[in-house]
Every structure is written in structure tokens, then in C-alpha cells.
Regions:
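Short, conserved active-site loop motifs that form the nucleotide-linked donor/cofactor pocket
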Residues: 42, 68-69
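Nucleotide phosphate-binding site architecture
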Residues: 22, 32, 99
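A short beta-strand-turn-helix
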Residues: 1-12
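Structural microenvironment flanking redox-active thiols in thiol-disulfide oxidoreductases
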Residues: 25-63, 74-80
């Protein structure tokens, strides 16, 4: 079942993650905090990649849901089209264009850079 997510693409943070990824567990809380403390709830999208929906739901049940958008890319179509190398990986999208890629887990320094340099 393929559904579209309508978002304002003027500024989006897309995080690719998987339930089996230990580094994804660590950055999950950082992304939720980033979204909730910077009024970015509709701008942060966590996309489960290289995983299935059951494992993704179990991950979120174990580690919590934030007030952000969650999606599952079971076919890897979005990730492949976006040039994702693996998980975790985070893309900053401004006006529909990927302007920055963070390959590997985000840290506090990356979060500060996002807050200070992007809308």
C-alpha cells in the first residue's frame, strides 16, 4: 500500500532509520527533542528503511513516538531515489532540494548546526 505524505517542502528534515540499527536508537530521542523544542513537528519525517512495518512499529512501541511524521519505505524506493547510503542518515531539504546530508548518527553539534543554519 503506497500512500503519499503531503508536507510543506520549504524545510524538511528526513531521517532514514531501521529497527535493527543501534545508532538509530540513540538519535531517535535527539530528533524528537529537536522537533518538539523548535516547533518543527511537521518538518521532521522519520523514514524506516531496509525494514518492514511490523519491526518499525515494535521499535516505536519500545522507544516511543514523538510528535513528528513516521513513514515506512519497505520497497526502499524513496531512499534509493534520495541517494541514501545506509542508516542512520539524515537529509536537510530546503525548497524541495537536499542541501545537506548527515551520514551516520546525529549528535548535539549536528542538531545545533541544523537549528542555527536552516529555517
Amino acid at each position: 500500500n503506497e500512500e503519499s505524505i503531503k508536507v510543506d517542502d520549504s524545510f524538511i528534515i528526513i531521517n532514514y532509520w531501521a529497527s535493527w540499527c543501534l545508532e538509530c536508537i540513540e538519535e531517535h530521542d535527539l530528533l524528537i527533542t529537536l522537533a518538539e523544542t523548535n516547533n518543527l513537528k511537521d518538518s521532521v519525517i522519520m523514514v524506516s528503511f531496509q525494514d518492514n512495518i511490523q519491526n518499525s512499529i515494535e521499535f516505536l512501541n519500545n522507544y516511543g513516538y514523538g510528535e513528528i511524521i513516521y513513514a515506512v519505505d519497505e520497497s526502499s524506493k524513496l531512499a534509493i531515489e534520495s541517494g541514501v547510503f545506509g542508516v542512520p542518515e539524515t537529509h536537510i531539504v530546503v525548497n524541495g532540494e537536499i542541501v545537506k546530508k548527515y551520514i551516520g548518527p546525529l549528535n548535539l553539534s549536528n542538531i545545533e548546526e541544523i537549528i542555527n543554519n536552516y529555517p
